[in-house]
Amino acid sequence: MKLRKYLFFYLFVAICIASLFTSCDEDDVIRSSEANITSFTFDTTVAANAAVLSQPVIDEANATITFKAEESGDVSALVPTIEVSAGATVTPASGSAVSFASGSATFTVVAEDGTSKVYTVSCNMSSLIQYDFETWATPEGAMYPEVVNPEGWATCNDAVALIKNMGPMFGGITYTGEYPVRQTTDAYSGSTAAMLESVDTQGGSILGQTIPKVTAGSMFLGTFNAMAAMSDPMATTEFGILYDKKPVKVLGYYKYTPGAEFYNAAGELQADRQDACAISAVLYEVESEDETLNGSTIYTSDKIVAMASFGTGETVAEYTPFELNLEYVKDYDASKTYKFAVIFSASADGAAYNAAVGSTLYIDDVTIENEVVAE
């Protein structure tokens, strides 16, 4: 009998304890108020997301998310992958097709406790201009038909053609070597790339104009003005093409080997100097289509609106990506007229006739990324 009383007593206590827990109302359970998007990405291997150029960047403080997409691409049914705070939900749901055709879309996150937060996701359209260096041809109006340049680019080949053709007659210079900028099958992708080599053009003068001991291999967006060669060599490089877009980035692939023997402008061997390659981009404003910056003014003019540069003196044996992010020193105004230059040189100080024989820069798959700006 006493054992039965104890059993009933313990059973009663157990029931009371259980009732304490089960009697708690669900509303008394602590629920999270976190309503954040912790990750927002696009799988660009999915066909629906092919237009996406950059992964989204989350600005938590302002509840905004931004990404870039190709101007000509389809953004009417992009499929984002979204992660949110534990226990929260998001609408539209992760994996759903969402239209960004209007430029933005909103996503609402609801926390466990019902707290909500609305994010605005903006799609900034960009346009791309790409150069693959597969097509080479003699420039229209070239003085010497043997000159071959990559499509869309000017090179120092025109200057070396002058040395080859005028040197023997007017300066006692006989240069029979390769042109500095050549098509090569050593490419990052496709069949060919551009090879820029600084070559030994002997030095001396032609009709009173100095010929460098080493001519730097160079390639640029712009025009080579052969008519200026005998009066002002720095004016031969007319940098920049008319540009109706706002460039923000220049990307591509390069590899580089500096030459062993460095010579100064006087043709003197400088055993203690090391060559380096240079890659730069310059956007500048013009009053007319004929206005241009040249070798003397391209980096110093007050017309410059944006610039970026990169260089290295290290040997880079394999194709390596480079990226120039333009830094704007003036506001971009779509109603104004601009020219844009991208410049590659196997010898960074080659314009001043300081370079190493054999410095070689390979360039392939160059892309200019432009922000779409309404007028």
Identify the residue ranges that each predicted region occupies.
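Extracellular carbohydrate recognition and processing domains
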Residues: 288-335, 356
